[in-house]
Amino acid sequence: MKMSTLRAVPVAAACVAAPSAAPAADLARETAVLVAVFRQQVREHLDAAERARGTVLCIAIDPGGAAQSPGQEFMARLAGEPSVRRAAGCDARPKGAVEAMTLRPAIIVTAGPIEWVADDEAWVAVAYFRSATYSAQRRYRVVREREGWVSLGPILLDGPL
């Protein structure tokens, strides 16, 4: 899976370098949802064993056909997590993703698109890449609670055969 094959999401100008005409409130809401998704991905992928290996989480947002690394303003929202990197600093190699400069093991996570189910609920497509054989695409449920936006985890849809 290449990052350029992932699906698109409209993103705030604060998230990536590209300008946007969306209203500021919508951009702030999208940014908050994406931050919630990436925080949840840190919890999901970087357990004690991965942290001991020095694994980093490299994040990208796809605003329309090509994944892009978030801008500094977006990254500042995740500053409390020292293992988070911009995807531009990582390489997706068949045997395993790595941080380009250090060759530390990496997981590349791309968020998008956002599907608004309600004013206080979004479903977000998330793709991750560890290696050519260990990668996936899923949808995550993100809801607005009193303390802000929270990613509740993957959406499992089941139906009759």
Where are these regions (language model features)?
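Flexible low-complexity loop/turn motifs enriched in small/helix-breaking residues
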Residues: A21-A136, L156-L161
